[in-house]
Amino acid sequence: MVWALTPVDTVRGAQRCYIFAAGTYKVGRKDCDVIVQTDTSISRVHAEIVVEKMVAWDPQSGAPANPSYVRVVDRSKYGTFFNKVQGTQGSRLHKDEDAMLADGDTVTFGTGNATFRLSFVPIVVFFHGKKSGRISPCLQAVMTSIGAYATRKWSDECTHVLVDESCSLTPELLDAVLAKKQIVLGDWFKVMAEKNIHTEMPSSTQYIPKLTLDGMEIQVVEIKLIESCLAGYTFILGSSEKYKFGDKLHALLESTGAKYLHVDEFCANSQDSGAGENDKDILLVPAKSPLEFSKIRGLFPLSKITDVKLFAAILSGHLEATAIEPPAYIVASSNSTDETIVVDSDVEIDTATSDHTVAASKSEHHIEHISDDKKEVVAISEEDAVNLVEAKTSINLHSDQEKDEIVKPMEEDVKVIEKTATMRGFKVEGEDIPVMTKVPKDETLDSRDETCHVIYTQNLVVKSILQSARAESIETGGINFKRFRKRGAVSGNSFKDLIPYSREPYRESDYERGTVTDFMREEKKRRQMEAIAEDLFNNAKPKKKAAAGSSIHTMLTGRR
């Protein structure tokens, strides 16, 4: 078990402390195990809480073992009081005096309101393992050091469930989930024993195991995350005997915030209330018999989930969309009264990729392929097709499925006008049969990429049997990748990019206009003028020096 020292009132600087191991713990203002900052009557080291040994929970009495082996020793100037009632002083301890404490006793440090209550926090562990297996001696020693009590019998007094990794899901574990008891691994108790004293219980998030159910691995989460994880969902159930852990199913759904209805009740209300249109109405199907409700028409619009996946969603704390099977819908046939059930996930949506869309109906027109000249033949009516069969011509049907597509002829003939198509005919027993043949690619117009417009009616169904890409690969022996090259593309190192300011790089247009010649003429003239000015300036210097020298010489000679 664990001892908790909890403040009775909201005291500044006081926190709840959990004692996980035997030892001596100091209480004071600063640098102590239990810090109390209320008034000046609290000494630096005011008192000591001595835990001689950790006692376990007694299953017979349903209380902690007696005695508790917890003492308080006063080390202060103003004293320590225990079981102090409002209006009374209680029992005061003088310096170095101690007293034995029990579950529920209160201790007041100093003359203020720093009152704490000593309470017992039981740790009763339900060991869920193999019947022949036992707890390892190392783990047993750790659990004894913190006062944990281990049992193999599940009861409401159990606080935790100890399991091994990848343990199978059992009804006892589901009972623990319903009772909101955390499922942990043995390492969690080792972490608790290492702390001695702490302000909170160690988190078990990293020490939650993985369980297995019918080969499926389930990552269990904390109990608080399981609560209300299925809120908003309504599950349609059959008899409880059909499901795995059926006796726990209703309670589990209620604990997760989900609702449930019986199949008969849902079918009775579906016609009036329109039930089944909500996406969160899910039919629960037994995993061992997935076709249990396949014959009930009113359940067709519902999504489905197996009981195994539902238990996995509850223990993991969330329901994934991939675990839900989408509903089936009914497609009514136009030629009969039968109805086809199509699963929503198998529906293929066709998107039109051209400007003209041909209605794909079962008509009397049929396209056939002649292997000799590789041309497509269009039979216009059923009568002509019958005549072809009677005459035993060499026209071969491409498949048996296409034979069934020939139906009664329409009143008007189909007229196809296309630039790249020509009409021809041949006689079978004296009757003309119109045939539309495609012109080979060599006989088409200039532009290969030109769009061909076909004037057609909805009664014509054209099926292209030969693909152009396949024919090209047979003729050339491989794909011609040059046909994908862009035409008219200019390289990045073109002359226009290197010399962007010249519009006509190969014609001396600037010289023809005379702009460059005038500029060079003016530049030459300017340089000549500068040269003349430079010469005049240089010639003027010696003359000035000579004139200055002669005048001085004259003055000197004149004085003599």
Curated annotation (Swiss-Prot):
Transmembrane regions: none
GO biological process, one term: reciprocal meiotic recombination
Cellular compartments per GO CC: chromosome; Mre11 complex
SMART domains, alphabetized: Nbs1_C
Domain FHA: 25-87
Expressing tissues: Mostly expressed in the shoot apex and young flower, but also in young leaves, root tips and stamen, tissues where frequent cell division or meiosis may occur.
Annotated localization: Nucleus; Chromosome
SUPFAM superfamilies recorded: BRCT domain (SSF52113), SMAD/FHA domain (SSF49879)
Keywords: Cell cycle, Chromosome, DNA damage, DNA repair, Nucleus
Predominant localisation class: nucleus
UniProt domain BRCT: residue ranges: 115-190
Gene Ontology MF annotations: damaged DNA binding
Family statement drawn from the similarity comment of this UniProt entry: Belongs to the Nibrin family.
Subunit and partners: Component of the MRN complex composed of two heterodimers RAD50 and MRE11 associated with a single NBS1.
Domain writeup: The FHA and BRCT domains are likely to have a crucial role for both binding to histone H2AFX and for relocalization of MRE11/RAD50 complex to the vicinity of DNA damage.
Function statement: Component of the MRN complex, which plays a central role in double-strand break (DSB) repair, DNA recombination, maintenance of telomere integrity and meiosis. The MRN complex is involved in the repair of DNA double-strand breaks (DSBs) via homologous recombination (HR), an error-free mechanism which primarily occurs during S and G2 phases. The complex (1) mediates the end resection of damaged DNA, which generates proper single-stranded DNA, a key initial steps in HR, and is (2) required for the recruitment of other repair factors and efficient activation of ATM and ATR upon DNA damage.
Protein name (Swiss-Prot/TrEMBL): Nibrin homolog
